[in-house]
Each structure stands twice: as C-alpha cells, then as structure tokens.
C-alpha cells in the first residue's frame, strides 16, 4: 500500500526542490517562500469492494502553486501535472486561479485524483 500524501510531497520536492506545505499549516506571521506548493486532501472515498471489504480508495487533492514570479505560475504547475501523471495521479485540465493572502504572490491550482488499490 502506498502512502499517497508522501508520494505527492516527495515527487514534487525531488523534482522542484521547493517547499510542499499542507494547506493551512503556515502560521499567520510566517513569511511566504519565494515559490512553493500547497496541497489539501479533499476526500478519500472507497470506490471498489470485494467480499464487503474496500479494494480501492480514491484520494482527491487540490494542489496549488504560488510564486512571486508570475511568469512561473502556469509553467511550473503544468510541469507538476506532467510529473504527477507519470507516478499515477489523474489530472484533468490545465488548472485554475487561486487567491493568495500576499500581494506579492500569485497562484494557480489543479485537482488531483489517485486510485489506491489495496
């Protein structure tokens, strides 16, 4: 069985060498890194059953990329999409704009699914 959160974090960290932060875990007085990813696990839904036991779980994540370099926001997120598809994540579309709490940063997000087979 795969640790899906660790797969997400490690894949992004190894490729981009940027912080990968669980959404909401930064303190209010903590400075934003120049560029970073955040993620949030929306749901984990059992999807397939055999003999009254779940055999598949669908992990649903939001992945956001923030940067003080607006030109990188689209390109890095699309690179992350390709990378994550290569390790088994399902990614539909090219993303959406996300709000930033800092005027210096812009953000873009994508939705990820991962089917964990048990």
Locate the predicted segments by residue.
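Short C-terminal domain-edge/linker segments immediately following a structured domain
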Residues: 52-54, 67-73, 92-97
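Short intrinsically disordered coil segments
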Residues: 52-58, 78-81
